[in-house]
Amino acid sequence: MAEEPTTTTLVTPEKLPSPSLTPSEVSESTQDALPTETETLEKVTETNPPETADTTTKPEEETAAEHHPPTVTETETASTEKQEVKDEASQKEVAEEKKSMIPQNLGSFKEESSKLSDLSNSEKKSLDELKHLVREALDNHQFTNTPEEVKIWGIPLLEDDRSDVVLLKFLRAREFKVKDSFAMLKNTIKWRKEFKIDELVEEDLVDDLDKVVFMHGHDREGHPVCYNVYGEFQNKELYNKTFSDEEKRKHFLRTRIQFLERSIRKLDFSSGGVSTIFQVNDMKNSPGLGKKELRSATKQAVELLQDNYPEFVFKQAFINVPWWYLVFYTVIGPFMTPRSKSKLVFAGPSRSAETLFKYISPEQVPVQYGGLSVDPCDCNPDFSLEDSASEITVKPGTKQTVEIIIYEKCELVWEIRVTGWEVSYKAEFVPEEKDAYTVVIQKPRKMRPSDEPVLTHSFKVNELGKVLLTVDNPTSKKKKLVYRFNVKPL
């Protein structure tokens, strides 16, 4: 039995094209997407001359249309291919059982404010005490043997609008214990001098790790997002080039520290600014615990980060988590503080994209992780990171239709994807004129996981009507539909 349709309507603010343009034929790109001669649906008929002339003589209506963005309606109905549900149900149940073994969020964590006005009286007192110790140390040259200004991440320890935020990181890392925080600060400054961090930042290091670690976009709260892709080390040539001997492991550590230092210097250390990073760790095809060189290098890097880079991680998301990682977490979990645990999020392969979307908007998530954002080196002339996307959950055995009502002549460009696909997708234009034919933009197509992750279409609209994007999910698993569109003037 078909379910009752459920509809949500929202108005999407878009850049509006001018309505005063003359009608034109459908573009060549659109013609390619239209039905062939063997299909029964045909191109929409042209508007007759009297109606066109009548439209151009009503400037009042044109003015109204100029300020009327497209209206979007999302409608859910029963799947027309529901018979496939039973065929896949048993396999999905097994997958769900495995997925349930992976822990999700291990506790709630709310990032502390970096505004001085939000500090408690005891926290303000601790900050003042730490600043006093720093002042004494500077006067007595405890940090350096020369009277030069001491900076960390390019910021002076005192007498700068950003200094308090830096000192607060050390205080929070040591639970506002002033002496412990000061000791940590001294050790960090000493290590930075020995490691020659300021010189390292300016070096031109050569590495092949641009696909292993990279920054891409921001989360919903404005934190820059760093992706760590461990599966790249399945490449034996890259692995040996990075970890085969002690010298190469040292070089790997230097490149990682340089990357982190450069990323930190782009953060906002002003009061109330964003001074932490969202870390995404992709565990897909990770070499695992058997690679002792990787394990040793990772352990060394983690220790350095904990000792010298306090409170720079907002959240640690582990995605595509394999079963063996549960063993690893069981070992290290008891040694982690509740505060550290509360920053961790885990997701298996089937829930990785959905988990990322909780924290990062789809337009900011790279295509390879279920989002719409292409590599910064690639060119996407139609969309940017600033073009927001909408998300819909397509329930098992249902069909979701996105209805975009057009009020003026324009070219509509859209991107659409369903994580993992395994659905049917079609697109069509339905004119407002009753006697006009529906135009098939994309005939029904069964999408497989091996198909292109993101579909991009465009359609020139020469009369009032609506574009319908329909996704039919016949499986027993809910899907995440993501789409966005832009309106271009003709």
Swiss-Prot record:
PROSITE patterns: CRAL_TRIO, GOLD
Residues annotated as domain CRAL-TRIO: 202-377
Example GO biological process: cell division
Name assigned to this protein: Patellin-3
InterPro entries: CRAL-TRIO_dom, CRAL-TRIO_dom_sf, CRAL/TRIO_N_dom, CRAL/TRIO_N_dom_sf, GOLD_dom, GOLD_dom_sf, PATL, PATL1-6_C_GOLD
GO terms assigned for molecular function: lipid binding
Note: 'Patella' means 'small plate' in Latin.
Keyword Transport among UniProt keywords: yes
Cross-link Glycyl lysine isopeptide (Lys-Gly) (interchain with G-Cter in ubiquitin), sequence positions: 193
Basic and acidic residues composition-biased segments: 57-69, 79-100, 109-121
Keyword flag Cell division: yes
Cell location: Membrane; Cytoplasm
Organism: Arabidopsis thaliana (Mouse-ear cress)
Modification Phosphoserine occurs at: 108
Annotated membrane topology: Peripheral membrane protein
UniProt cross-references to Gene3D superfamilies, sorted A to Z: CRAL-TRIO lipid binding domain, GOLD domain
GO cellular component, one term: plasma membrane
Annotated GOLD domain residues: 353-487
Role summary: Carrier protein that may be involved in membrane-trafficking events associated with cell plate formation during cytokinesis. Binds to some hydrophobic molecules such as phosphoinositides and promotes their transfer between the different cellular sites.
Keywords attached to this entry: Acetylation, Cell cycle, Cell division, Cytoplasm, Isopeptide bond, Lipid-binding, Membrane, Phosphoprotein, Transport, Ubl conjugation
